[in-house]
Regions:
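Short, surface-exposed, charge-dense and proline/glycine-enriched linear segments
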Residues: 12, 35-37, 132
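Metallo-beta-lactamase
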Residues: 16-114
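Generic preference for hydrophobic/aromatic residues in regular secondary structure cores
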Residues: 1-3, 32, 70, 133
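Terminal amphipathic helices with adjacent charged low-complexity linkers/tails
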Residues: 108-131
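Active-site HxH/HxHxD metal-binding segment of metal-dependent hydrolases
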Residues: 1-11
Length: 133
């Protein structure tokens, strides 16, 4: 048994898992895992929604509905971790992973096959700057 941390990689038979620690994005031991060859970010508690449906992907539901549910989820579970969220989004950008993400698979809710809208919303919701209404 080996503990992993940010920057560690694990080859699992021709596929590479890259690890990004994300403490206090809901839990102290939170971590993102990126499956490099497929472009899938397993985001733990980030980018989720509190919904449970038989269809798994964002494309099966209206974007407005999923973003409303994601905003409620963010408000209840992620808001206190907004400073860490901003750091993690910047880290994903700085190490070139953000543009490689083709899909986000959170622990809760639908899988984002089109991750751009939820990443944009998380950037907005996590911003410390006031927004005009």
């Amino acid at each position: 048994l080996t503990a992993v941390q940010t920057g560690d990689e694990l080859d699992i038979g021709g596929r590479t898992l890259k690890f990004i620690s994300a403490p206090m994005l809901h839990w102290p031991d939170s971590m993102f895992t990126f499956l490099a060859e497929e472009g899938i970010l397993f985001s733990n508690d980030a980018f989720g929604q509190h919904v449970c449906h038989s269809k798994r992907f964002d494309k099966d539901y209206s974007l407005d509905y999923l973003l409303r549910e994601a905003q409620k989820y963010y408000a209840n579970l992620v808001t206190l971790g907004s400073p860490m969220l901003r750091m993690k989004l910047q880290e994903l950008t700085d190490n070139g992973l953000l543009e490689q993400i083709k899909m986000i698979a959170p622990c809760h809710g639908q899988i984002w096959k089109n991750p751009a809208p939820i990443v944009e919303k998380y950037s907005e919701w996590g911003s410390p700057l006031p927004r005009q209404q």
